[in-house]
Each structure stands twice: as structure tokens, then as C-alpha cells.
């Protein structure tokens, strides 16, 4: 992992067409702005993780329901 120090209004460039700018800093947080092509999806990591967790939970629940159903069909 590359770690860089940036002050407010300073930026980094990633590849072609992606700029990440520190907009504001405060105690324990930093607000960043991202300029990127509209074709590039930008998501917060915690939202991606939340969707993964919900999908996993849904699969586990469906497995349990299928197991119950198969037991009823065997009887």
C-alpha cells in the first residue's frame, strides 16, 4: 500500500483521468473529492461490504429453507 501525506486542496492523480483531492480535514476525518470518468464506478468500501454481508446472509437463509423443504419432501 502506498501512503501519501496531502494537505487541504492538494491532489493525487491515479492513472489517466482520476484525481483525488483533499477538500477538508478535521479531527479524525478527511473529506475527499474524486474526479473520474463517469464510466468508472466509485463506491464507499463499507457499502460494498454491507451488500456482500447481506447477500451472504440471504444465501445462508435460503440454504436453511431448502434443507427444511427437502426434509419435508423425504417424509
UniProtKB/Swiss-Prot annotation:
Source taxon at top rank: Bacteria
One Pfam family of this chain: CsrA
Traits of the deletion mutant: No visible growth phenotype, increased expression of the flagellin A (flaA) the major flagellar filament component. Flagella appear normal, the average swimming distance decreases about 20%. Expression of other flagellar genes is not visibly affected unless flaA is also mutated, when an increase in their expression is then seen. mRNA for flaA remain localized to the cell pole. A double csrA-fliW deletion expresses the same amount of flagellin A as the csrA deletion, has 2 wild-type length flagella, a wild-type swimming distance and restored cell pole localization of flaA mRNA.
Chief subcellular location: cytoplasm
Cellular-component GO terms for this entry: cytosol
Record keywords: Bacterial flagellum biogenesis, Cytoplasm, Repressor, RNA-binding, Translation regulation
Location in the cell: Cytoplasm
Record function comment: A translational regulator that binds mRNA to regulate translation initiation and/or mRNA stability. Usually binds in the 5'-UTR at or near the Shine-Dalgarno sequence preventing ribosome-binding, thus repressing translation. Binds mRNA; 77% of enriched bound RNA is for flagellin A (flaA) while another 13% encodes other flagellar or motility-related genes. Binds mRNA in 5'-UTR or intergenic regions, binds consensus 5'-AAGGA-3' in the loop of a predicted stem-loop structure.
Subunit organization: Homodimer; the beta-strands of each monomer intercalate to form a hydrophobic core while the alpha-helices form wings that extend away from the core. Binds to FliW.
Family stated for the protein in its record: Belongs to the CsrA/RsmA family.
Protein name: Translational regulator CsrA
Species name: Campylobacter jejuni subsp. jejuni serotype O:2 (strain ATCC 700819 / NCTC 11168)
